[in-house]
Structure formats: structure tokens, C-alpha cells
Curated annotation (Swiss-Prot):
The keyword Kinase does not apply. Secreted effector that completely suppresses the host cell death induced by cell death-inducing proteins. One of its GO terms (cellular component) is extracellular region. It comes from Plasmopara viticola. The RxLR-dEER motif acts to carry the protein into the host cell cytoplasm through binding to cell surface phosphatidylinositol-3-phosphate. Transmembrane segments: none annotated. Residues 1-19 form the signal peptide. This is Secreted RxLR effector protein 69. The keyword Signal applies. Belongs to the RxLR effector family. Glycans are attached at N120. It is found in: Secreted; Host nucleus. A motif (RxLR-dEER) lies at residues 38-53.
């Protein structure tokens, strides 16, 4: 390595150190980096009291709420699926769909999207049940 290269690198390092110390002094921070990190860690460990609250980042809250909503939709779709497939309580499921103002087509899409799909035979059977239910109980809306 040439001596001019060494001098250039050494000069750049001195300027960098000088710039950092000047910036720290201008910000009125006289502490070294280890002491600053120690203070940051100690401040993070303090327990907040009273009206102060520990706030989670928005992305964390959003993803947790999304997972919760997804789980609820999955459970609801699973319940719909098994009541419609098993010839039990399908009238209750149809009444629930009516109160939520959902059609059978939208309910089948909801179940297929959030749980699993139906075979064509099962869809035909459910449509026949729904038609019979609809004849007995006209749509309230």
C-alpha cells in the first residue's frame, strides 16, 4: 500500500471522528455511546404507571386483530359447513343467514373461502333444502 493512500485513509478517519464529536457536542450530549445505550436500556425497563400506557406498534396490533378475525371467520364457516352437510339444524342456519341478510350463494362462497368447498352433489342437496325452507318461510326483507 502506498504511503499517500495510508495518509488519505487516516485523514478521513480523523475527520469522521471529529465530525461525530462535534455533532454530539452541538446536541449537548456529552455521554459516550456505552453510557447512552445503558440509559436507553434502563428507560425501556421502567414500568409506566397512571395514565401512561405501553403502546404496541400499529403493525403488531393490526396483525393480531387480523389473525383473530380470520380465526372467527374460520370457526363460523366451519359451523355453517357442518350444519349444512349433516342434515341437522339446517333451518337454524338458514334463519341465521336471514338475520344477517345473507343469501345462500354468498354463504356458500363464505364457507368455501374460509373453510372448504362443497361437492356438486352436496350443493344441490343444500339448495333443495334451502328452497323448501324458503317456501315455508318467505324472506323477511
Amino acid at each position: 500500500m502506498h504511503s499517500s493512500t495510508i495518509l488519505f485513509v487516516l485523514g478521513a478517519a480523523i475527520l469522521a471522528v471529529n465530525g461525530v464529536t462535534t455533532a454530539l457536542i452541538d446536541d449537548e450530549v456529552d455521554k459516550g455511546t456505552q453510557e447512552k445505550h445503558r440509559l436507553l436500556r434502563s428507560n425501556l425497563m421502567k414500568h409506566e404507571t397512571g395514565e401512561e400506557r405501553f403502546e404496541l406498534p400499529a403493525w403488531f396490533i393490526g396483525s393480531k386483530a387480523y389473525k383473530q378475525r380470520k380465526r372467527e371467520r374460520y370457526e363460523q364457516a366451519k359451523r355453517y359447513y357442518y350444519t349444512l352437510v349433516q342434515d341437522k339444524n339446517h333451518d337454524e342456519t338458514f334463519r341465521e343467514l336471514d338475520t344477517k341478510r345473507k343469501t345462500l350463494k354468498s354463504a356458500l362462497k363464505f364457507i368455501a373461502w374460509n373453510y372448504k368447498g362443497f361437492s356438486n352433489y352436496t350443493k344441490r342437496r343444500i339448495r333443495k333444502k334451502y328452497t323448501a325452507y324458503r317456501i315455508k318461510n318467505p324472506r323477511p326483507w
